[in-house]
Every structure is written in C-alpha cells, then in structure tokens.
Amino acid sequence: MELKVLGSSSSGNCYILDNGNEALILEAGVRFLEVKKALGFNLRKVVGCLITHQHNDHAKYIKAMVESGFYTLALPEVWTAKQVGGSRCLEIKPGKGYKFGNFKVLPFSACHDVPCVGYLIEHPDCGRLFFLTDSCMCEYRFIGLNNVLVECNYSDKKLTEAIKDGRTLPSQRDRLMTSHFELSSCKSFLASNDLSQVSNIVLLHLSDNNSDEPFFVSEIERQTGKAVYAARPGLTINIDRM
C-alpha cells in the first residue's frame, strides 16, 4: 500500500491510499485533475472518499468526487455547506463504522472551529491507520496502530516569532490554539498511544509561517524512534504493515 500526498496545507489537502487494485481518497481540497493524475487516470479502482470537514482546503472539490461516482463520506454539515446531494453522498453517523472495498473506516470526533472528524482506517495491506488533521486535541486513545497521519501545524515558539516579525496576525493565536494541533500537543498524543507496531508517522498540515519542518520531524523521530515524514505534495511512501 502506498500513501500519496497531493496537498497538505491551507492551500489544499488530499491524500490517497493506493495498493494498485483499490484506492481510498482522503479529503477533496485539491483540483480533481491532480487526483486523476495521481491515480494514473484509473478511476475504477477508487472505492471511496473521506472528508473531515467543510473548509475549502479540505472539501472544495467534493462535488467532483461525487460526480465521478465515488461514494463520499462526510458530516451532514459538509453536504449542507457545499450544497451537494445524491445517492453517493454518505452522511456520517456517530459511532457507526463503514466499509469501502477492503477498507474499514471508523470516524471519530475532532476539535476544530466547525464540526470535524478524524478517521481510523483499517486494511489488510497497511493495517490500522490513524488520520487526524485540523484539530486542537484528540480525546481518544488507540491500540494496534500501524501508521499514523497526524497534524502538527505550529509550535508556540514559532508562532510567537512570526507574530513578533509581523508574518502572522496576533488575532490568529487564539484561533490556532482552539483549532489546530500544536507541536507539544502532537507529542503528547503520540506519547499517550501504543506505537509499538507503528511503522510510519506522517506530520500533516504544517503552517508556512508558524512551523519548522526539519525541527518538527527530528523532534518526533527522537521521541518515537519511528520513521517520520512531513507531508508535502509529491511525497509517496510505502505504508505496508510490517
């Protein structure tokens, strides 16, 4: 199984889990043409698309997903905000699991400034994969994880520097603190979960102004002893369960 990163920032987010025979799309925040290119224009293998919340950098192209015949899972608020409907539009119901091909999917609540979810995804090839972006915390703990995709948007230190330098508005501090994962929060989350079977940790949605990619990656590597990557367009990694 490969993880393909098409976008992981406020400009647009999209990831694909692809084993060659079937593919699951996470988020619809990049142009659909880019999705088709990443799939080698083989749309038949797409078994579904998962959306975390309604913001455009995650859901702008949700209509294209549905119109291409992909079963797409999202909160009711997303369908209302994007004014998209039809038999391929699946509404998340709390505590309910879903199956797309051989992918088992369990949504869980996240903490953002609009209704938002993360996903626990399981497949025979990649094992159990955790996916959380755009959330200031995670109230759940998980066992048996094999791959972790988690937001690490900013650090308090880099945010303070960016505000002082005028690169980030002071008003952004409160919003970030209540809607995105800070470095120390990311580290605390990882420390509180069993990572013994984890092969890869991928850091998502790093802020352009308020993060430090090399430092973030090295900090998480030092803490966990795992292979750590910062998500960026074009990144492809093998996420087969070891």
Which residues does each PLM region occupy?
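Short, polar loop motifs at secondary-structure junctions
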Residues: V30-R31, H55, L75-A81, K93-K96, ...
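Active-site environment of divalent metal-dependent phosphoester hydrolases
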Residues: Q54-A59, T80-A81, D113-P115, M137-Y140, ...
